[in-house]
């Protein structure tokens, strides 16, 4: 441990180093040009304060066509040398091998953590080799699973390291990219809130998407690996993307041209918002999914206008907490809601109530009459002040609301409301209500 402490004292760390782990799933599929482009992306990432760590999956040996231990080892070495050479014009990197032992129970044990720590503290990019030594034997093995990435994360989050660095991002770079979406027939899920969406995405992969057996297995394994990762380290942001997207050099901040890794380091957001309507032509299709542990969503929805929710009764039964709901609305809008007056107006006419986490965000949808017909109307959309800058909460609430009211949803906003740009992007139609200060929005 003294070597790590020495290294950290040497460079006098003034702040925690933010690491970004890139798991390269099939290095054997990469061209020299793609490796060079990755070097440029890594250089940009480092200029933004991120410290990249590259983990090479052992699946690259599928192009080796040999079972000989020595041949496999030489093949992996040659692939790592090729990567090192192609990166060398952009960043200083170092291949790390021998950091882990493969125990008899199949688990990886960190033998020399400073083998990863020291290069990071010296401003180098560690490239973790999938070749490990079998404990107690002079034999070597090639790790083909998520276990290697997981061991690297454990090493970087160990007590020795945790004061000096944090793991912020874990990026899976492979041929399949993000999780395919039935709804986005030509693209992938944009932002996945794993607590809320794991089962739905698993169901899509297994039952709803037309995939080859190999593609299905890759997507399922990615989903399960992300769940393992975020269950253990809930504050990490996961990304899944393709080689093409990960090595994009373009700087244009629009849709497909944005490198998703660089964009996420800058903003912690996907390159487009997950609550944008899929059907709109202006919503770009991407091959990247951002994955968060996310936030629990509670949804109370009614099927018909004559079955409006009784919020007071739900509060009495402990199903909801009106005191917390009032605090959320007050804090979000910066004014004191007269709850008694509000409930007199909407109670028993509430079409839906959506609550994110512990009342950190929420939406109240009411049934309103229009020409004798009941329509779902977004009465309140609120996010507490301290979470308003955090990507995703408004998106997650909005997405849950759109899923609950697919047929039709209306809302209005003052014409000078700065949030209107966000609303324009999420509505299918909108128009200015003549002679008033309101603009009406529609989706469905």
What is the predicted function of each stretch?
Residues 243-248, 345-348:
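A glycine-rich phosphate-binding loop feature that marks nucleotide/adenosyl-phosphate handling sites
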Residues 389-402:
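Conserved acetyl-CoA-binding loop-helix of GNAT-fold acetyltransferases
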Residues 249, 258, 262-318, 328-343, ...:
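Terminal substrate-recognition subdomain of acyl/acetyltransferases
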Residues 179-183, 247-252, 419-422:
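Short active-site-adjacent structural elements
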Residues 314-389:
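A conserved beta-strand-loop-helix scaffold within acyl/acetyltransferase catalytic domains
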Residues 1-246, 312-319:
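Nucleotide/pyrophosphate-binding catalytic subdomain
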Residues 25, 57, 368, 381, ...:
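Structured beta-strand/turn binding interfaces of compact recognition modules in eukaryotic regulators
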Residues 39, 223-231, 251-255, 259-268:
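Alpha-helical repeat solenoid scaffolds
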């Amino acid at each position: 441990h003294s070597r790590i402490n020495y290294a950290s004292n040497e460079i006098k760390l003034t702040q925690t180093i933010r690491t970004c782990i890139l798991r390269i799933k099939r290095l054997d599929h990469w061209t020299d040009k793609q490796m060079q482009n990755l070097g440029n992306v890594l250089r940009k990432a480092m200029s933004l304060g991120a410290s990249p760590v590259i983990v090479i999956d052992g699946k690259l040996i599928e192009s080796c066509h040999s079972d000989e231990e020595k041949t496999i080892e030489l093949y992996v070495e040659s692939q790592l040398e090729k990567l090192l050479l192609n990166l060398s014009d952009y960043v200083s990197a170092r291949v790390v091998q021998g950091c882990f032992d493969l125990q008899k129970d199949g688990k990886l044990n960190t033998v020399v953590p400073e083998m990863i720590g020291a290069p990071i503290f010296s401003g180098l990019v560690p490239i973790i080799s999938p070749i490990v030594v079998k404990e107690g034997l002079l034999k070597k093995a090639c790790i083909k699973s998520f276990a290697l990435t997981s061991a690297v994360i454990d090493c970087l989050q160990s007590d020795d390291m945790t004061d000096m660095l944090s793991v912020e991002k874990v990026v899976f770079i492979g041929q399949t990219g993000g999780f395919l979406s039935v709804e986005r027939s030509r693209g992938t899920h944009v932002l996945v809130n794993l607590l809320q969406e794991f089962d739905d995405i698993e169901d899509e992969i297994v039952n709803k998407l037309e995939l080859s057996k190999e593609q299905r297995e890759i997507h399922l394994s990615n989903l399960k690996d992300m769940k393992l990762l975020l269950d253990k380290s809930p504050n990490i942001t996961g990304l899944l993307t393709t080689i093409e997207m990960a090595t994009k050099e373009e700087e244009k901040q629009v849709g497909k041209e944005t490198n998703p890794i660089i964009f996420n380091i800058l903003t912690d957001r996907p390159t487009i918002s997950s609550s944008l309507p899929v059907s709109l032509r202006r919503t770009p299709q991407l091959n990247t999914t951002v994955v968060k542990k996310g936030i629990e969503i509670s949804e109370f929805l009614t099927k018909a206008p004559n079955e409006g929710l009784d919020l007071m009764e739900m509060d009495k039964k402990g199903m909801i907490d009106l005191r917390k709901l009032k605090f959320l609305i007050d804090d979000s809008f910066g004014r004191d809601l007269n709850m008694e007056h509000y409930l007199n107006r909407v109670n028993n006419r509430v079409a839906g109530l959506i609550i994110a986490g512990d009342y950190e965000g929420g939406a109240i949808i009411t049934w309103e009459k229009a020409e004798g017909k009941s329509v779902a109307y977004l009465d309140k959309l609120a996010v507490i002040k301290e979470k308003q800058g955090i990507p995703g909460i408004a998106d997650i609430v909005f997405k849950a609301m759109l899923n609950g009211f697919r047929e039709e949803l209306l809302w209005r906003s003052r014409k000078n409301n700065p949030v209107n740009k966000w609303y324009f992007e999420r509505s299918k139609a909108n128009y200015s209500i003549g002679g008033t200060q309101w603009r009406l929005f529609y989706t469905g």
